[in-house]
């Protein structure tokens, strides 16, 4: 009750979190390419996006470029893993580097983990909040949309340090009041699904990924096999 705020999808949870934690002129670090809402959400909150490029072919992070994006005005960093649109899954080593920078500069991490169960090739999802020293400076966003194939339901949540929960809920209340109560009840049931559900979900998506790669690559398309 002190950490979880339900909202109208992770999209609204992201907006509520930014409005609750950012002041005009603050800077927000985000990796590009990125899901289309992150930059505009920061701008609507009065903040300034600072972009760090993920490099092809496997969308690696340049640690020097990442470190150079942090300064005294940096208030937050957004991490989306598995990443939309690249399919990159951030490694524990990459997340540890991000965590070290967050601690050094006293920066809040906002993580969008909506694809956490859709991972391929033996990759593992590592929540940034599980990295040492990050539980108290991470807001984790998620939703029912992708894991349970109900994107139209618009049920999501933010898991925040207790000290931030009140501010996020206040903004959420004035944005949308709340997600549909019957759909929240259904979501609570879905969250108790057995582990076999998630394994079958990921396996099904991986089969479709492999099918598309097998069609595209022989025809001359350069493809990065998404990890998630």
Question: Positions of the model-derived regions?
Answer:
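Phosphate-binding glycine-rich loop
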Residues: 1-27
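A short helix-loop-beta submotif of the ANL/AMP-binding
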Residues: 44-50
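Short hydrophobic alpha-helical segments of the AMP-binding
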Residues: 21, 28, 41-42, 102
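Active-site phosphate-binding strand-loop segment of PLP-dependent enzymes
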Residues: 54-121
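Conserved core segment of the aminotransferase class I/II
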Residues: 131, 136-206, 210-221
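Short beta-strand
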Residues: 222-227
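Helix C-cap/helix->beta junction micro-motif
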Residues: 45, 104-105, 219
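Generic structural signal for small/hydrophobic residues in well-ordered secondary structure
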Residues: 4, 28-29, 42, 77, ...
């Amino acid at each position: 009750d002190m950490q979880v705020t339900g909202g109208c999808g992770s999209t609204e949870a992201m907006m509520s979190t930014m409005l609750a934690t950012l002041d005009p002129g603050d800077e927000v670090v985000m990796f590009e390419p990125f899901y289309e809402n992150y930059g505009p959400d920061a701008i609507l909150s009065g903040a300034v996006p600072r972009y760090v490029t993920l490099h092809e072919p496997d969308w690696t992070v340049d640690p020097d470029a990442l470190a150079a994006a942090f300064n005294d005005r940096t208030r937050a960093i957004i991490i989306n893993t598995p990443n939309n649109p690249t399919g990159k899954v951030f490694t524990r080593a990459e997340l540890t580097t991000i965590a070290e920078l967050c601690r050094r500069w006293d920066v809040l991490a906002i993580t969008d983990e909506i694809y956490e169960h859709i991972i391929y090739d033996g990759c593992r999802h590592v929540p940034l909040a599980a990295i040492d020293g990050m539980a108290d400076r991470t807001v984790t966003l998620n939703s029912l949309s992708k894991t349970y194939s109900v994107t139209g339901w618009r049920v999501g949540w933010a898991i925040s340090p207790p000290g931030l929960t009140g501010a996020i809920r206040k903004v959420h209340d004035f944005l949308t009041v709340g997600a549909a109560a019957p759909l929240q009840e259904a979501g609570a049931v879905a969250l108790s699904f057995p582990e076999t559900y998630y394994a079958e979900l990921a396996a099904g998506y991986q089969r479709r990924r492999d099918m598309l790669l097998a069609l595209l690559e022989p025809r001359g398309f350069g493809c990065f096999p998404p990890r998630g």
